Amino acid sequence: MRYCPEYCIEVPDDFPVEELTTFMAAARSVLLQPEKGPEWREFAGATNLIGWRYRASTEDWTIYKDCWLQNGPAVNHETLYRRQRALFGMFTSGVSCVESATYALAALASHPGVASIRFDSQRQRDCSPARLRNWIEGKPKAQNLVEQLSKLCTSEDWKLWIDLRNRMSHRSNLPTIVRGAVGGAPPPAKALEFAATSSTPPLAGDLDLFDTLHVWLASTLKSLLIAGTDLCGDGR
């Protein structure tokens, strides 16, 4: 963990602190000049969530990993509950990181000195990476952000984040596969082994399977923050 001056809290080591700091300075140079406008309220609230949710996602994933390493596959219902709760928290907070960043970028882009996009109450409710990409396409200084949002929207990693979040939020837990054997030792258990559901694929892998999802998340946030700084242009 390391200290983040913007949030005044500790954040995971791989959180893009430097890119966030640069992005916030660039945004302030636009949104607070000559005075604080309505865009700042929406922007400030969303940017606070980026780091908070990233830390929460990382902490919940660490809880799952520690539980697996300490207890292995054969656990009681109470421990299974704790694991499923940790996965739910990981995916809910991880998706929130990206959605909060997207909302903050839309609020920034709505400023007359940036891209002057419409960001009324309806658009605030509808905001998503794909919609923001469409709203800013063709705007000056928005090329990098359009490219990063396009990469995000077509990413298989992002699809997995969304699908698992939605499954656990609205439909069911991820069904854990438990293997046994007759007349011999069961095959080695995997830390992550879940059956397919009506909306999610089967998953089987070791802990590094979801470690890589956090690597992707940190990299994506970094790219979005850099693109947001570019969007501010000469206002920096």
Protein language model features and the residues they cover:
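Acidic, Ser/Thr/Gly/Pro-rich intrinsically disordered interaction regions
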Residues: 1-52, 56-59, 77-92, 100-236
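Conserved helix-loop functional segments at active or binding sites
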Residues: 70
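Short N-terminal edge-element motif at the start of the domain
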Residues: 64-67
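Charged, low-complexity interaction regions
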Residues: 73-75
